[in-house]
Curated annotation (Swiss-Prot):
Belongs to the RNA methyltransferase TrmD family. GO terms for molecular function: tRNA (guanine(37)-N1)-methyltransferase activity. NCBIfam families: PRK00026.1, trmD. Homodimer. It comes from Pseudomonas aeruginosa (strain ATCC 15692 / DSM 22644 / CIP 104116 / JCM 14847 / LMG 12228 / 1C / PRS 101 / PAO1). GO terms for cellular component: cytosol. Pfam families: tRNA_m1G_MT. This is tRNA (guanine-N(1)-)-methyltransferase. It catalyses: guanosine(37) in tRNA + S-adenosyl-L-methionine = N(1)-methylguanosine(37) in tRNA + S-adenosyl-L-homocysteine + H(+).
Length: 252
């Protein structure tokens, strides 16, 4: 049976998610039936004419906090729509586990996700304690809400669904998939502004091309994200290729 993913999103700005439902790889996955993406707006679960979803924080301080009841109403309908699927509830939060490719692979194993996109100063902690299974962050910086992180997560996970990408090997060759940054890529023309495409890529020798790409990925990772190499065990071939890359760089 083909792997499919059901995603429900709780957000006061559901229109933002048209950026992934209507465009790109995620849109194609929706059309192919690989991805189901549905949004619920907490404002639809309020009882006042202003559709208020936030209130002042107890203890004072700046900003507002999202209220529990509208979030619970939206979450209840999302759970119901998930049907018999076991849906993991995720809150996009700066306090959460940082999203890496390894984490993306974990999430891609789920059959259903419900993403809570907060706003303002955050959401009432009691909602998190009662309903949230995991908190995830996309980085140590401040955004205006959880919508963009939620879209990042959906895009990253969708890429791992079999059939979502145009080429079966595309996801495996992405940066971080094997713990390394990606190698450089080139297309026509062969010469641009006196810069030539590396000869090995024109050689037609698949083994030489594979080794060159691996060496470039290792070298680029060593130069730009050496921390990734600290948590990755290099094979004998990789150690040799990296040492050769560093030697060539020092000699140039």
């Amino acid at each position: 049976m083909d792997k499919r993913l059901w995603v429900g999103v709780v957000s006061i700005f559901p229109e933002m998610f048209r950026a992934i439902s209507d465009y790109g790889i995620t849109s194609r996955a929706v059309k192919q039936g690989l991805l189901t993406l549905t949004c619920w707006n907490p404002r639809d679960y309020t009882e006042d004419r202003h559709q208020t979803v936030d209130d002042r924080p107890f203890g004072g301080g700046p900003g507002m906090v999202m209220k529990i009841k509208p979030l619970e109403g939206a979450l209840a309908d999302a759970r119901q729509a998930a049907g018999g699927r076991k849906a993991k509830v995720i809150y996009l939060s700066p306090q959460g586990r940082q999203l890496t490719q390894a984490g993306v692979r974990e999430l891609a194993e789920e059959e259903a996700l419900i993403l809570i996109a907060g706003r303002y100063e955050g959401i009432d902690e009691r909602f998190i304690e009662e309903h949230v299974d995991e908190e995830w962050s996309i980085g140590d910086y401040v955004l205006s809400g959880g919508e963009l992180p939620a879209m990042v997560l959906v895009d990253a996970v969708t890429r791992l669904l079999p059939g979502a990408l145009g080429h079966a090997d595309s996801a495996e060759e992405d940066s971080f998939t094997d713990g390394l940054l990606d190698c450089p890529h080139y297309t026509r023309p062969e010469v641009y502004a006196d810069k030539r495409v590396p000869e090995v890529l024109l050689s037609g020798n698949h083994e030489h091309i594979r080794r060159w790409r691996l060496q470039q990925a290792l070298g680029r990772t060593w130069e730009r994200r050496a921390d990734l190499l600290d948590s990755r065990s290099l094979s004998g071939e990789e150690q040799k290729l990296l040492a050769e890359y560093i030697r060539q760089r020092d000699d140039s």
